[in-house]
Amino acid sequence: MSKISKIIARQVFDSRGNPTIETEVFVKNVSASAICPSGASTGTYEAFEKRDINNKKYLGKSVLKPVEFINKVISNKLKNFNVHQQEKIDNLLIRLDGTKQKKRVGANAILSVSIAVKKLSSKIKKIPIYKNLLINKNFRLPYPLMNIINGGAHANNGLRIQEFMIRPDKAKSFSEGVRMCFIVINKLRDLIKKMGHSTSVGDEGGFAPMINDNESALKLIVKAINLSGFKNGKDVAICLDVAANELLKNKKYSIHSKKHTSVDKSIDNYLKLINKYKIKSIEDPFGENDWSAWTKLLNKTKNKIQIVGDDLFVTNLERLKIGFLNISANSILIKLNQIGTLTETLEVIKFAKLIGYKTIISHRSGDSEDTFIADFAIGTDSNQIKTGSLARSERVSKYNQLLRIEHELGKKSKMHIID
């Protein structure tokens, strides 16, 4: 028998020291738990994160009310449900909330239950989580998008762009990809030290040096790649997360300097950076409602680089369909807490693959030691994973889980494809 006997939720803390929800689901004496992450720069259309805004003991950031709702309501509603019936369970959770953006129960409460159910199902079946998610029979490992310099909302320096990342495009295995990133990161650390800057890290483990312009950061990264013995744009690619929602004012953007400029000027500046620094991926280059700007950039780049929608799509099927019709992007970032259940997330991934989009599984800036997204990336045959740098254990834990899976798969293990 695989009937859920009880569900216990508790308040724990994420990597930024903020309260979050951990939910443990039981089938008799067997249990599995999941911790919900939290974002810093969030899209307007994301599912709602419920907090106790009137609880002054935790400065309005506690999650004690959603924890209580799980323990008193969801636990009773899901009792005796078959733990393997993920879709049925998720649909009940969606109905319990009854709002478009999960504002009644909160996506943080719902997701912690949804993931814990899948983990427990895998445990009872005695199979790895990624095999319990399998979209197809491939066991392909994703390319890591490693955040090596933090800016924007993830750091307190003057950088406009939120994340400067590297991707080891010529890696023949996941472990080789991590090794390549490791070398570049160490060379970058040495360069930052020589400049007299601190090598302290931001929320996602990337360095946060006190430099004030995007090009200075890009030049540093190119130098680190070269010193590592790699070719920029071939062996290792530079990728950006602009988080342009944070830089939008009166239909103008302050992406490339503090001065706000038009969409056309911003696109010209992007094209210069792409050509000069061989950038292969740009996430959220424009605001979440600026569909025409996205389309212009995609056309100007002739679909030759990865244009990734995060705040644009918020892991939402309706938003993705609009983006597809507008020809706005060619890739989607997948964040489970943006939509709130595994079932809804899988629907988005399946549609993205159907229309030829690359899927990139992502952490959040407020994350935890939970490694579920590592299995999720392989189980959904996603092209890339974005889960920070080789620093901070809540980031490294995901890479370590992928290394374990690669080792377990042995000769069956292979890397995904980077076009």
Predicted regions located by residue number:
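Short beta-strand elements
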Residues: 11, 21-38, 146-168, 223, ...
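Glycine/serine-rich anion-binding loops at beta->alpha junctions
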Residues: 13-15, 98-117, 144-156, 201
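Mobile "lid/hinge" segments at catalytic clefts and subdomain interfaces of large enzymes
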Residues: 139-202
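Active-site-proximal beta-alpha loop/turn segments in soluble metabolic enzymes
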Residues: 163-174, 198-214, 243-256
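Catalytic core of soluble alpha/beta enzymes
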Residues: 215-419
